[in-house]
């Protein structure tokens, strides 16, 4: 079989104007960026305001191996499968970060015959939205250090007299806004800025600083959760950048940088239109990770697609404990649109990995034994799939299991897994997913199950209520959402939660940052663990995004590169074509 990039390169694509017309966009509702990309204006939502929304299908997964289980393949393949059944459909996915592209997982365009195309343009820069987020974020970081420098250099009263601005009196030790970049770079997790030659202060005042990856920026979450440009402007103004010497929050509005940050993101708020290999219109917008952010594409993209098509297929990052939880408790509470159906992607290799019998290391190839028949390992790991089915049903949503088939998979084991699912007393639909090898035709069975599931009654319910305290919400997600026995809070986390409650942020949602490789916060606990303890070590405030961000275990907001990173395989040939991208 051809490589992903060769399949993409040898498949004829339609001009983006044809894809826009197919989606139902008018000529003044999109702007082309080259032959195969366009920026889409949300004005079409106003034009179609009276039109009934389509059905929203959310694709999630079992607890994945480090390489993933084919969620994007399933998302794109399912959209093509629905089209193959003559349904009006669009897909909505996140923009890939270059961190994973050059790091462990590689690209995020899907794979095989279920891809968004051109996949190299999607995976590398696209229309520059992530760079815009990075620039807007770092503008605020520069503004903070500049304000500290000018106020402290002159003295607060002299600064006020000279500028006519109020002194913000920022505490240099309580700046909470780190810088960001769209790469994995562990060396930048902790740095010092403002370093000067002896006796000089020209470079600012020295303080400890650090970098996060751009996907973890609060601005990325704001981009994904904003309903329009004005909403984004208001949210950016609420971002807390630091605290002053009286322990009061200093916002982007107070620093008078919120307007410029919004200007930098003016074009980024427009989703990018592309196409699948079979011509399904696909909106790409925002790129928050699900382990260190809220892990879902944008509300704006969903709203546009739901007005233009009968079915919208989107995905939530990692397993249902991660992206699905955040889709239901953060995204849906903001958009007031719940999924009509949940698709859980399961694989033989992923379930065997959840038996705990294999030693999997991020950045290393999966062991060959995972691809060999092993009924005992499959049966042991099946508990993980049952957990994820139960988890989706906690939210009152119909469930379809898509068994993503790999070429090495045993037909006997595929049949056995399907039988086990059919025997569950949980009213779950199931089908084999062959989108990678066969495109839309290989997804028709899953698509039929999804159509039926979307017509089934749903009774959506989030896990917690806004009026609960932040601590109560975190405990609810950990106990009801993950099944842990005890939640512990570090002294730092306790102090932070008390501060946020006092400052009036108690009604915000909670966004858990934890490993995606276990339902727990310990990546070594496989299957369906219960009774474990989760330690919340730090809680960060994202007032503009509308949540607090609880860090557990050893999760990092700036990833590092593995010993054999994906960038080693990338190059460019004499024709200017990229090679080695997957």
UniProtKB/Swiss-Prot annotation:
Biochemical pathway: One-carbon metabolism; tetrahydrofolate interconversion
Family assignment from sequence similarity: Belongs to the formate--tetrahydrofolate ligase family.
Disulfide cross-links: none
Protein keywords: ATP-binding, Ligase, Nucleotide-binding, One-carbon metabolism
Protein name: Formate--tetrahydrofolate ligase
Catalytic activity: (6S)-5,6,7,8-tetrahydrofolate + formate + ATP = (6R)-10-formyltetrahydrofolate + ADP + phosphate
An MF annotation (GO) of this entry: formate-tetrahydrofolate ligase activity
GO biological-process terms attached to the record: tetrahydrofolate interconversion
Keyword ATP-binding recorded: yes
Enzyme Commission identifier(s): 6.3.4.3
Gene3D superfamilies: Domain 2, N(10)-formyltetrahydrofolate synthetase, Formyltetrahydrofolate synthetase, domain 3, P-loop containing nucleotide triphosphate hydrolases
Record keyword Lipoprotein present: no
Positions contributing to ATP binding: 65-72
Membrane-spanning ranges: none
NCBIfam families linked to this entry: PRK13505.1 (NF010030), PRK13506.1 (NF010031)
InterPro entries: Formate_THF_ligase (IPR000559), Formate_THF_ligase_CS (IPR020628), P-loop_NTPase (IPR027417)
Family matches, as Pfam families: FTHFS (PF01268)
The organism's place on the tree of life at top rank: Bacteria
Gene source species: Vibrio vulnificus (strain CMCP6)
